[in-house]
From Swiss-Prot:
Enzyme class, spelled out: translocase
Organism field: Buchnera aphidicola subsp. Schizaphis graminum (strain Sg)
Protein's UniProt name: NADH-quinone oxidoreductase subunit H
Gene encoding the protein: nuoH
Domain of life of the organism encoding this protein: Bacteria
Enzyme Commission (EC) number: 7.1.1.-
Family note: Belongs to the complex I subunit 1 family.
HAMAP family per the UniProt record, alphabetical: NDH1_NuoH
Stretches that traverse the bilayer: 15-35, 82-102, 114-134, 149-169, 186-206, 243-263, 265-285, 302-322
Length: 322
């Protein structure tokens, strides 16, 4: 401890914790990309990646080597500084939410009193990555994808926040730890089912996942806003998408399904099991649902999801007041 009363070793220990968890999440996200391809192959009655290693077990290493040795190309007429900054923002934005999630009753890296607001802030920051990427690429398909992504994400963020208001009203706090502790008896998914449903839908849209993958639809926009990216820059966008899936799945498990509280006891195992379950739901949705038109996506958000979140908030307020 120095003259200012700051424990240097405790700070270094916290930094080590954060670093190890971030490395684990990045590795898990990279592995998830291969697992998704295997699951999609299973659902579509084909083999999937099976050439590198035993049953394709080394495909992740092959993909990493390929991305590392690809030319890291920058378009000639692009805005180079913004072009380079965009994948970094996409990679980092939702990754920073992970340390605010309580893993066990006794293990939490950062205890923020405004944990939910911090998540919403980071979710809003991810929009800038897409918008900057599309605009700075100087490509019409990239720009169209960025415009789609910005409009879709900003629309769905409205009820992404509103769907959490019922949970916040019940727990009386924006702190994620307080929200988890309020679910010792009953998980929030039971009294807040409509809130959970809208948050899950908005989370899919936030991750730009099927069926809300309009910004990067290959058939219409030739891969959308990151068409001009290659090498490690594309890898950051690619891994960033899976990090967002992990973050949203972990938040759903924490806010609506009791977090580390299980059917008996409380441990990291329950949080991990719930998170993996929702990740599999993401993959299953991609394998089974068609992609609707862009106007249908926007109409669904404003005409169905937004009224549903407002109705859920009114019902929650009514039961709290009585």
């Amino acid at each position: 401890m120095n003259s200012l009363g700051i424990n240097i070793y405790e700070i270094l220990f916290q930094i080590l914790h954060i670093t190890l968890i971030i490395i684990f999440i990045i590795f898990f996200a990279a592995t998830l990309s291969i697992l998704e391809r295997k699951f999609l192959a299973f659902f579509q009655n084909r083999h999937g990646p099976n050439r590198v290693g035993w049953f394709g077990s080394l495909q992740l290493c092959a993909d990493m080597i390929k991305i590392l040795f690809k030319e890291d190309w920058v378009p000639q007429f692009s805005k180079k500084s913004i072009f380079i900054l965009s994948p970094i923002i996409a990679f980092v934005s939702l990754l920073l939410v992970i340390p605010t999630i309580p893993f066990t009753p006794n293990f939490l890296i950062i205890n923020l009193n405004i944990g939910i607001l911090f998540f919403l802030m980071m979710a809003s920051l991810s929009v800038y990555a897409v918008l900057f990427a599309g605009w700075s690429s100087n490509n019409k398909y990239s720009l169209l994808g960025a415009i789609r992504a910005s409009a879709q994400t900003l629309s769905y963020e409205v009820f992404l926040g509103l769907s959490l208001m019922g949970v916040i009203a019940r727990s009386g706090s924006f702190n994620i730890v307080d929200i988890v502790n309020s679910q010792k008896e009953v998980w929030n998914v039971i009294p807040q089912f409509f809130g959970f449903l809208c948050f899950f839908i908005a989370g899919i849209a936030l991750c730009h996942r099927h069926p809300f993958d309009q910004p990067e639809s290959e058939q219409e926009l030739a891969d959308g806003y990151h068409i001009e990216y290659s090498g490690m820059k594309f890898g950051l966008f690619f891994i960033g998408e899976y990090i967002s899936i992990i973050t949203v799945s972990a938040l759903i498990s924490t806010v609506f399904f009791g977090g580390y509280f299980g059917f008996w006891g409380s441990s990291f195992f329950w949080l991990f099991l719930k998170t993996v379950f929702f990740i599999l739901i993401f993959i299953l949705i991609r394998a089974s649902l068609p992609r609707p038109k862009y106007d249908q996506i926007m109409s669904f958000g404003w005409k169905i999801c937004l009224p549903l979140t407002l109705l859920n908030l009114i019902i929650t307020a009514f039961f709290i007041l009585i």
